Structures are given as structure tokens and as C-alpha cells.
């Protein structure tokens, strides 16, 4: 789950119609929820918005009490505490009757959650507070009994109980002594028999914190606050009615009117019972609201139809009254018949309207059906075109691209596959079913002549030109090998002059034989070329044997591994091997280039590399190996 799926919302900001109720970054007072749950969050708050607006109106009508003695909130002395209580006592009724409260310090339970350890130590709870007390009343009571030292408070309402738990958080600016004095004062007020505000509770950490505070000689606040207690009793009795009255006043749609049998929920954990009860009540209220809306719609529709019927009846009666006197007497005589006729006409009109509505519904169904049919046809056309693309168009394009590639590299393909073509021709010549006297031979000759006339600049490529070119290349390679062997022989003192003469004679005899073979006949050219290549290879093997026996040749690299690696990197950076492979092979091959470098690194031998490359490049392997070995990076 990414951070984009989470947003931070503030229920209070939403209920107060603030624009910053939803943020993408976390801030104090904002709750993280999934972005998909944002709509449900708004729906839930919209259901509660009327209640909050009524409370906000009460808040707006409430004004703060203008007290001149601003220092009466401190309980450092008895006089200060009693003055504060008297001040609260004077303004308590005014605050409730005139809604003279500044602003509710109530917070949602999620926002009220303590952030620091100081908040935990300054937080207590009141268990058993009546649910009938409104937020404004509780706010006024808390300010009066704590001398306006309550920072914020929150409440947890049970779905099955008539009381709620109120959490109070005092201001952290209070000193420890003042905090303990305030709690003692509240405890004394709550212990009164006439006041039903619940019991004061706090956890073990707060208890240890209070025990660590030593009042010493500090005066304990006066617990005889009879006037304040009497006023609180009066307020509670006015706002908390009897149980029988409340049951009669509860609306049937109110969630508190539902009674849930907790015996059926015995298998459910106790932690989730309250939430489940809330969900059940919400579900029931939603169902009732939906049913009520349906009934309202039905009643409105029935009233509309009945109104239409009555209007038609009245119109018919008006028409009958506007007749002539004679007609009117006749109509008076048959008044009953006219009334029945109007009723029948009204009934017929109503049936016609129903038929029209049914016709409209039928037209809508036909329209939707036609739209669905068109959509299905378009999908079928799309699938058919896609199938045609995959099975016909793309294979034809690949075939055409392959034929274009073959036509551009026509000469290379012929020379590389010459032996295969000759073998195919040989097989067809001996085939019984092959038509040697083809009827279209003359037509092919005619088209060939026309093509030659249209393209006179194209040179005719014959077997003789190809053979002569190959003979020249073989002679050049033999001359190079002869020169290399001469240089090696001159440097080597152990090689005799007779071996040099034998090598020269061997090269000359092979050259003479190759020239005689090419001049003999054209039909046996392929076999003679192969024989010539084998003879050339034998002569080259002889030269390699001579070179290896000499021992003074740079064909074997004597570099160390580190130095060889450096030289190979220089050779790779120069891209000379890539260019040679692309030039003689016609296509660039990464694997072949890597194979050449791996061979040089492992064997460090020029002739072994030449033998390996013979299979791929044939005679061009000599040029490739010589070019690599003459590169600056490979020189000693």
C-alpha cells in the first residue's frame, strides 16, 4: 500500500465546513484513513451534521461571562478558592439559562487520545454521568467545579446503558499542588448524595503522581460548598427527567429505542459488543428510513394520481354545466348516467396513462437492447480485424521484409550458399520427375536479355570471375605467408637453408597446381577449389610447424595476465575487432567478438585463433588475425 492511498481527515473541520478538513500530510488532530473510505466518512458525518449544527448554534448563542476578577481561578489560598466558587455560583444559572459559555472544549475520542505522558497524568474520568445532560450543561458544570482549569474533555456513550464515561484533561500549566487541590475539590462535590455526576476515577500512574505531591502546610480547599452543590442539584434535576417520561418521549426512529438481546451475543468478545450494537442500531435505522422513504414516495404517487382523477372528474362536470338549458334539463335527468360516464372516462384515461408509461418503458428496453447489440457487433468486428492482423497481415509483412533482405544481399547469399545450390542442381538433374526440357526456358532467356539491356551498367558475374578473384586472394595470402616465413627463417639461426628452399618450392608447386586446376574445366570447379583449399591449409600447417620450431615469433604472447588484460581492454576500446567481424561476416555478432577476446586471453596464440576462425571466415580469417596481431595494443 502506497502513501497515495492514505489521506488525513478531521471530523471537526468537516462538520464546521472548513476547507482544510482533508489533507495529504499528517498533522495534529487529523486521522489517517484510506482514500477509498473517504465517501463513507463523508456519509457518516453528513448523517450527524444536523445534530452538530444545532449544537454549534447553541455555541454561537453562548457568550462568555465577563468576570472582572481574572485571578480567582488560582487556589493558592482559601480566600481565592472561596471567591472563585462564589463567582461561579453567581454566574452558573446565567451561564445555563442565557447560554453564556464561550466555546465547548469537547473533543472527539480519537482527537482526545493523550499525546504525551503529561497529558496522561493530567487526565481523569467520571464514570456514570447521565446521558441526558447536554454538552453545554456539562461544559458549564466542569468549568464551575474546576475553576475553569479543564483544558478539554470527551465522552464515551454506551449503546446499552443510560450513562456515559466522561474524560477530563486539565491544563498542564497547573502546578502539582493546584492540580491536587482541584481534584480534592471535585471529589468532595461528587461525594455529595444529592449530586448524580458519577464517580471520579484515574489510573495507577495518576494515583502515584498524586501520592508524590505533598501539600505540607498548604490549606485544603473548603469542602462546604452548599450553594454550589444546591445549584448543581437543581441543574441536574431539570435536565435529567424520569425514566418513564424518557421512554415515552423517545422517538421510534431514535437509536436508543432499540433493545438488543445481549444473550444472543454471548459468543462475541466483550470488546466488540458495543461496536456491534452500534452497527446493528445503525442498520435498523437505515432500513426504517429507507422503508419510510418508500412509503412517502408511494403515498405521494397515489395522491398525485387521485388528484389527477379528481381534476378530470371536475372538468367533466364543468363541461356538462356549461350546456344549454334544454341540454341542462336533459343532463339533470340523466345526472347519474353522466356521473358514471365521467368516472368511466377518468378510469379509461388513467388506464391510457398507464399504457403510455408501459410503452415508454418498452421503448427504453428496445433502445437498450439495440445499443447492446451494436456494442456486441462492434466487439465482433474488432476481434475479426485483430485475428486478420495476427494471421494474415503480420506474416505477410514478415515474409515481404525477408524477401527484401534477400534481394538486397543477393550476391552474398549466392556466394555463401553456392555449394548448397550446386548440390540441389545435382539432385534435380538426376531426378526422374524433373523436366529438363522446360517450356519456359526461352521466356526466361528473353526476359534476361531485356533486363540486361535496361541495366547495361551492371557487370556480369560469372563463375570464371569468381574463381579468378578467389585465386588472386589465395595467391596474396600465400605471398604474405611466404614473406612471414622468410622473415622468421632469417631471424632463426637453427633453421637451415634447405628448409627455406623446400617451403618456397611447396608454395610454387601449389600455386601452379591451383592455376592448372582453374584453367582445366568449369564443371569441376567446386571440387578443385576444395582440393586447393586443403592443399593451402597443408602448406600453412607446414609454415606453422616451422614457426613453432623457431621459437622467436610474436604469434605467442608473452605478457603477464594483468598486462594482457590491459592490452585487451585497449583493443576492445579501439573497436577494431567489431569492425572486422562486421566487415567480413556482413552482420555484427556480439558473441563472436567475445569469443575472439576469450580465445586470445586463454591461449595467447595467434595460430590457434586462426584455426578457430577458419570455420567461420575461411580465408578471411588470415586477414582478421593479422590485423588484430598488428594492432598497437598487441605489439610487445
Swiss-Prot record:
Q: What is this protein called?
A: U1 small nuclear ribonucleoprotein component SNU71
The record's subcellular location field reads: Cytoplasm; Nucleus
Q: Can you name a GO cellular component term?
A: U1 snRNP
Keyword terms: Coiled coil, Cytoplasm, mRNA processing, mRNA splicing, Nucleus, Ribonucleoprotein, RNA-binding, Spliceosome
Q: Which family does it belong to?
A: Belongs to the SNU71 family.
Functional description taken from the UniProt entry = Component of the U1 snRNP particle, which recognizes and binds the 5'-splice site of pre-mRNA. Together with other non-snRNP factors, U1 snRNP forms the spliceosomal commitment complex, that targets pre-mRNA to the splicing pathway.
Query: What InterPro entries would the database entry show?
Result: PWI_dom
Starting at the broadest rank, the lineage of the source organism is:
Eukaryota, Fungi, Dikarya, Ascomycota, Saccharomycotina
Q: A GO molecular-function term, please? A: RNA binding
Amino acid at each position: 500500500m502506497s502513501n497515495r492511498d492514505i489521506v488525513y481527515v478531521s471530523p471537526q473541520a468537516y462538520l464546521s465546513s472548513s476547507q482544510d478538513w482533508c489533507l495529504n500530510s499528517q498533522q495534529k488532530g487529523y486521522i489517517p484513513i484510506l482514500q477509498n473510505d473517504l465517501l463513507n466518512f463523508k456519509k457518516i458525518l453528513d448523517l450527524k451534521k444536523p445534530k452538530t449544527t444545532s449544537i454549534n448554534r447553541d455555541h454561537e448563542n453562548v457568550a462568555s461571562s465577563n468576570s472582572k476578577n481574572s485571578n480567582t481561578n488560582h487556589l493558592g489560598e482559601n480566600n481565592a478558592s472561596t471567591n472563585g466558587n462564589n463567582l461561579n455560583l453567581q454566574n452558573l444559572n446565567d451561564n445555563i439559562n442565557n447560554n453564556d459559555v464561550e466555546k465547548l472544549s469537547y473533543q472527539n475520542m480519537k482527537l482526545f487520545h493523550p499525546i504525551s505522558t503529561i497529558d496522561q497524568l493530567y487526565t481523569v474520568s467520571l464514570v456514570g454521568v447521565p446521558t441526558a445532560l447536554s454538552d453545554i450543561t456539562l461544559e458549564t458544570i466542569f468549568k464551575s467545579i474546576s475553576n475553569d482549569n479543564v483544558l478539554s474533555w470527551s465522552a464515551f456513550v454506551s449503546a446499552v446503558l443510560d450513562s456515559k464515561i466522561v474524560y477530563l484533561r486539565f491544563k498542564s500549566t497547573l502546578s502539582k499542588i493546584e492540580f491536587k487541590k482541584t481534584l480534592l475539590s471535585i471529589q468532595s462535590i461528587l461525594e455529595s448524595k444529592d449530586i448524580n455526576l458519577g464517580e471520579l476515577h484515574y489510573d495507577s500512574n495518576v494515583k502515584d503522581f498524586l501520592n508524590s505531591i505533598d501539600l505540607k502546610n498548604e490549606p485544603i480547599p473548603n469542602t462546604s460548598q452548599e450553594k454550589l452543590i444546591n445549584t448543581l442539584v437543581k441543574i441536574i434535576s431539570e435536565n435529567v427527567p424520569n425514566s418513564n417520561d424518557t421512554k415515552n418521549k423517545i422517538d421510534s426512529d431514535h437509536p436508543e429505542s432499540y433493545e438488543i438481546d445481549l444473550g444472543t451475543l454471548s459468543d462475541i468478545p466483550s470488546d466488540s459488543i458495543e461496536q456491534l450494537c452500534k452497527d446493528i442500531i445503525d442498520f435498523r435505522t437505515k432500513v426504517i428510513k429507507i422503508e419510510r422513504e418508500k412509503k412517502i414516495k408511494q403515498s405521494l404517487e397515489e395522491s398525485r394520481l387521485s388528484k389527477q382523477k379528481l381534476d378530470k372528474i371536475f372538468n367533466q362536470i364543468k363541461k356538462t354545466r356549461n350546456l344549454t338549458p334544454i341540454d341542462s334539463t336533459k343532463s339533470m335527468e340523466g345526472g347519474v348516467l353522466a356521473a358514471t360516464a365521467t368516472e368511466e372516462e377518468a378510469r379509461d384515461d388513467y388506464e391510457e396513462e398507464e399504457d403510455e408509461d408501459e410503452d415508454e418503458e418498452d421503448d427504453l428496453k428496445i433502445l437498450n437492447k439495440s445499443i447492446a447489440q451494436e456494442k456486441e457487433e462492434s466487439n465482433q468486428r474488432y476481434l475479426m480485424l485483430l485475428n486478420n492482423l495476427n494471421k494474415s497481415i503480420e506474416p505477410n509483412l514478415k515474409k515481404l521484409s525477408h524477401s527484401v533482405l534477400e534481394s538486397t544481399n543477393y550476391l552474398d547469399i549466392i556466394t555463401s550458399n553456392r555449394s548448397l545450390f550446386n548440390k540441389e542442381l545435382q539432385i534435380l538433374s538426376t531426378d526422374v520427375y524433373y523436366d529438363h526440357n522446360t517450356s519456359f526456358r526461352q521466356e526466361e532467356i528473353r526476359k534476361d536479355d531485356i533486363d540486361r539491356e535496361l541495366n547495361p551498367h551492371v557487370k556480369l558475374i560469372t563463375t570464371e570471375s569468381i574463381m579468378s578473384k578467389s585465386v588472386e586472394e589465395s595467391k596474396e595470402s600465400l605471398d604474405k605467408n611466404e614473406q612471414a616465413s622468410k622473415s622468421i627463417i632469417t631471424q632463426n639461426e637453427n633453421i637451415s637453408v634447405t628448409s627455406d628452399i623446400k617451403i618456397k618450392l611447396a608454395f610454387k608447386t601449389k600455386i601452379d597446381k591451383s592455376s592448372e586446376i582453374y584453367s582445366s574445366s568449369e564443371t569441376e570447379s567446386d571440387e578443385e577449389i576444395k582440393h586447393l583449399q586443403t592443399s593451402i591449409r597443408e602448406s600453412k600447417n607446414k609454415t606453422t610447424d616451422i614457426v613453432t620450431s623457431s621459437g622467436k615469433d610474436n604469434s605467442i604472447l608473452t605478457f603477464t595476465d594483468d598486462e594482457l588484460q590491459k592490452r585487451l581492454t585497449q583493443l576492445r576500446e579501439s573497436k577494431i575487432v567489431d569492425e572486422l567481424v562486421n566487415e567480413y561476416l556482413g552482420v555484427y555478432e556480439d558473441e563472436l567478438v567475445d569469443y575472439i577476446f576469450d580465445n586470445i586471453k586463454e591461449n595467447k596464440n595467434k595460430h590457434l585463433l586462426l584455426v578457430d576462425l577458419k570455420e567461420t571466415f575461411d580465408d578471411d580469417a588470415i586477414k582478421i588475425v593479422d590485423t588484430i596481431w598488428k594492432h598497437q595494443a598487441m605489439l610487445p
